[in-house]
Amino acid sequence: MADDLGLDLGKKKKSKKVIKIDGDDAPVETGVEAVEDGLGELNLGAKKKKKTPKTAGEEVVEEKVPTLEIGIGAQNLIDAKGAWPDYTYEEALTLVYQVMKDKNPDFAGDKKKFAIKLPEVARAGSKKTAFSNFLEICRLMKRQDKHVLQFLLAELGTTGSIDGSNCLIVKGRWQQKQFESVLRKYIKEYVMCHTCKSPETQLTKDTRLFFLQCTNCGSRCSVTAIKSGFKAVVGKRAAIRRAEEATAGK
């Protein structure tokens, strides 16, 4: 039908706009084509990088960013290789221990742990407690049984003795944790070195004082004397009272 009527229903083409300037016979064209014609051979595309030619027998070496070494050997905060990194407290403490181990290789190893056997406790009758491996623990601590027994009875505030089967019989009802607590206190005071915490020590007596001599670090210090604990007066109260009244009446 459009052909019969002679109509053109297609898209209308844009016509070039021509601007005439007074005094100039040549028309000026506008639009994209005019701009492109004016630029000529000017190329506004991305500039390509030029590749450097490789010569025969030459290897390409990549430049690596230098990393800061640990700051142990540096004398100042800023050394020849650059500034120290910011260390946290834990990292700085690790560096200090590392320097100490490097300067003192003898103390670089782990500390030896001193372990003893647990007390073997059982009932001995209705009012007594048997400590069967008392002498064995004394040998492990390398201490005289008389000294350990004196400290044990003073801390518990009771009486006791070693029977014929080398078993300690203590008056009263006691549990294993109570004997263990007293032995820990004894080890801390009379076995472990007060300077380096080593169990390799010797307990010696000079005049009336006891001294703890360490074979590891060589330190020597005095230890406290054993003091008797609280002792309850159970019997003979009437006799004691009469004796006090008799002395007061005189």
Swiss-Prot record:
SUPFAM superfamilies per UniProt: Translation initiation factor 2 beta, aIF2beta, N-terminal domain, Zinc-binding domain of translation initiation factor 2 beta
Source organism superkingdom: Eukaryota
Pfam families per UniProt: eIF-5_eIF-2B
Gene Ontology MF terms in the entry: mRNA binding; translation initiation factor activity; translation initiation factor binding; zinc ion binding
SMART domains found in the cross-reference section: eIF2B_5
Keyword Protein biosynthesis attributed: yes
Alphabetical keyword list: Cytoplasm, Initiation factor, Metal-binding, Protein biosynthesis, Zinc, Zinc-finger
Zn finger limits (C4-type): 193-217
Principal location class: cytoplasm
Alphabetical GO biological process terms: cytoplasmic translational initiation; determination of adult lifespan; formation of translation preinitiation complex; regulation of multicellular organism growth; translation
Keyword Mitochondrion (UniProt): no
Taxonomic lineage of the native organism: Eukaryota, Metazoa, Ecdysozoa, Nematoda, Chromadorea
Subunit field text: Eukaryotic translation initiation factor 2 eIF2 is a heterotrimeric complex composed of an alpha, a beta and a gamma subunit.
Cellular compartments annotated: Cytoplasm, Cytosol
Biological function: Component of the eIF2 complex that functions in the early steps of protein synthesis by forming a ternary complex with GTP and initiator tRNA. This complex binds to a 40S ribosomal subunit, followed by mRNA binding to form a 43S pre-initiation complex (43S PIC). Junction of the 60S ribosomal subunit to form the 80S initiation complex is preceded by hydrolysis of the GTP bound to eIF2 and release of an eIF2-GDP binary complex. In order for eIF2 to recycle and catalyze another round of initiation, the GDP bound to eIF2 must exchange with GTP by way of a reaction catalyzed by eIF2B.
Name recorded for this polypeptide: Eukaryotic translation initiation factor 2 subunit 2
